[in-house]
């Protein structure tokens, strides 16, 4: 997961209060993200799901 610190037009910015980017993967297939977006607190990994978070609000 690449975190973007600059402001290129291609990257969206997270809404106020949700300034972490994240990707969610299934543990059975860690190469294809199931969901991505913005969140306020990085979720904990579970047996089925792995989360990868960034501490920036530039989503890619």
From Swiss-Prot:
CDD domains, per database record: TFP_snake_toxin
Tissues showing expression: Expressed by the venom gland.
Keyword Glycoprotein found: no
GO BP, sorted A to Z: killing of cells of another organism
Keywords assigned by UniProt, alphabetized: Cardiotoxin, Cytolysis, Disulfide bond, Membrane, Secreted, Target cell membrane, Target membrane, Toxin
PROSITE patterns for the chain: SNAKE_TOXIN (PS00272)
GO cellular component: extracellular region; membrane; other organism cell membrane
Cell compartments where the protein resides: Secreted; Target cell membrane
GO molecular function: toxin activity
InterPro entries assigned to the protein according to its UniProt record, in alphabetical order: Cytotoxin_Cobra (IPR003572), Snake_3FTx (IPR003571), Snake_toxin-like_sf (IPR045860), Snake_toxin_con_site (IPR018354), Toxin_cobra-type (IPR054131)
Disulfide bond sites: 3-21, 14-38, 42-53, 54-59
UniProt similarity note: Belongs to the three-finger toxin family. Short-chain subfamily. Type IA cytotoxin sub-subfamily.
Described function: Shows cytolytic activity on many different cells by forming pore in lipid membranes. In vivo, increases heart rate or kills the animal by cardiac arrest. In addition, it binds to heparin with high affinity, interacts with Kv channel-interacting protein 1 (KCNIP1) in a calcium-independent manner, and binds to integrin alpha-V/beta-3 (ITGAV/ITGB3) with moderate affinity.
Complexes and interactors: Monomer in solution; Homodimer and oligomer in the presence of negatively charged lipids forming a pore with a size ranging between 20 and 30 Angstroms.
Protein name: Cytotoxin SP13b
């Amino acid at each position: 997961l690449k975190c973007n610190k600059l402001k290129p037009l291609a990257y969206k910015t997270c809404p106020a209060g949700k300034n972490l980017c994240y990707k969610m993967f299934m543990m059975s297939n860690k190469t294809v993200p199931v969901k991505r977006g913005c969140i306020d607190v990085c979720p904990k990994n579970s047996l089925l799901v792995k989360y990868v978070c960034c501490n920036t609000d530039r989503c890619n």
